[in-house]
């Protein structure tokens, strides 16, 4: 599909980049943008060449979530969800529009979380609240600036999160922290977000884009087969008891898929490509925290 100027979708080889592009509104998501986001993620999902999907925001800010200015229109049916999607016209219940919007974004969030063949990265600067924060909960990696602003303000608007703010968040930061963030609706910094487990790594604002690009390039250097299988286990084994989860790892052995002969030789000889990859990972990820 054709994407509007509010959502920029770029494909550079195996790397997709989705940019929220309403900086004058902190990149909040209109109904039409949510439809486009769904289609953009779907495009990456079914692209056999896609290996990395990056989410970022224009104008030094990530995403402030829903465009709440549209909420009264949704409730009064002046803004039909059908105008932005292929779903049928809402039923008699005026709240149906909002229900369909939330359902669509829940599907989008689940699709991001379940991208087994594609590694997802959120690059966060500025505002990351509401639905923007919920998008990061679905991603494999989150890079953020120390001064980025995080929060779940829905309760102060008489709303409840619908895209994983209550559900996924508990798995990321625990039940008590999730209650604190959702029920009190206070704002916290990127540094706090890292301490609490929302963020993998903090980077300075000027380094966010190059560090994100370097991480994407590092991911591309890994075995696609091994990444796919590892993501599958990491995604689904965590939802079942450990005894059951162990079964997910049974087929994953050195004989289960294509072997990287050079990689095995490097491991044996402590030299070559494998050692180079480990040094590169350490240089990028472990040795340069701020």
Description of each model-found segment:
Residues 110-225:
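Crotonase-fold acyl-CoA enzyme core
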